[in-house]
């Protein structure tokens, strides 16, 4: 085989290996049972405002950039400030866990003490207690198909730093529910 052909063949083989490796990087959730269910209690996934909100059961006006992102995969939004110690802890936790799940999640890291209007929009839409604007606030969003086959947007938000196990559970749930609602297996 001529030298140029070997180089091209080697390059194609390497590209195929990289593609297969990247494709296999998605987390396998076959046999996974979600940690949190749909509902209106504190740790549940919500489709409307939860019981702790001043408007329990009211519909959420989801920002357009969130809806656009959810067309691809589940979303995590971290709202934080530069001078917040618990924000730094939450960023570290998310950074560590996203090493495993980054391919399956769209992540927004938004400083609320900047001029990014998405922070205000996210607080308005996803503050579980309505109006406190506490940081850090971590928001998990996914699609969910109910027993009648209707797909809804489900979300959960948490004010303060979270344990690594809770963050990972919400991420895995989000990926699982998203895949189930979009016809894919876990």
Predicted regions and their residues:
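Typically the conserved alpha-helix immediately C-terminal to a functionally engaged Cys/Sec
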Residues: 65-66, 88-101
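N-terminal targeting signals for export/organelle localization
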Residues: 1-56, 174-186
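Extracellular/periplasmic catalytic domains that process cell-envelope and extracellular macromolecules
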Residues: 69-71, 102, 128-134
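C-type cytochrome heme c attachment motif
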Residues: 81-89, 136-139
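Non-catalytic, surface beta->alpha helical segment in thiol-disulfide oxidoreductase systems
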Residues: 133-186
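Solvent-exposed loop/turn segments at secondary-structure junctions
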Residues: 81-86, 112-117, 145-147, 160-164
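Short active-site neighborhood of thiol/selenol oxidoreductases, capturing the structured segment around
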Residues: 67-82
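Thiol-based oxidoreductase modules, predominantly thioredoxin-like and allied folds used
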Residues: 60, 79, 103-120
């Amino acid at each position: 085989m001529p030298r140029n052909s070997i180089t091209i063949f080697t390059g194609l083989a390497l590209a195929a290996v990289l593609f297969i490796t990247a494709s296999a990087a998605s987390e396998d959730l076959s046999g996974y049972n979600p940690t949190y269910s749909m509902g209106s209690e504190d740790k549940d996934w919500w489709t409307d405002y939860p019981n702790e909100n001043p408007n329990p059961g009211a519909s959420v006006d989801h920002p357009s950039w969130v809806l656009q992102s959810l067309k691809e995969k589940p979303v995590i939004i971290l709202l934080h400030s530069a001078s917040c110690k618990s924000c730094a802890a939450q960023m570290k936790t998310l950074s560590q866990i996203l090493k495993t799940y980054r391919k399956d999640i769209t992540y927004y890291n938004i400083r609320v003490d900047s001029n990014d209007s998405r922070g205000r929009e996210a607080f308005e839409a996803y503050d579980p207690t309505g109006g406190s604007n506490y940081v850090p606030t971590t928001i998990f969003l996914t699609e969910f198909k109910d027993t009648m086959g209707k797909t809804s947007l489900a979300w959960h938000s948490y004010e303060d730093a979270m344990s690594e196990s809770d963050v990972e559970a919400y991420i895995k749930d989000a990926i699982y529910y998203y895949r189930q609602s979009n016809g894919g297996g876990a």
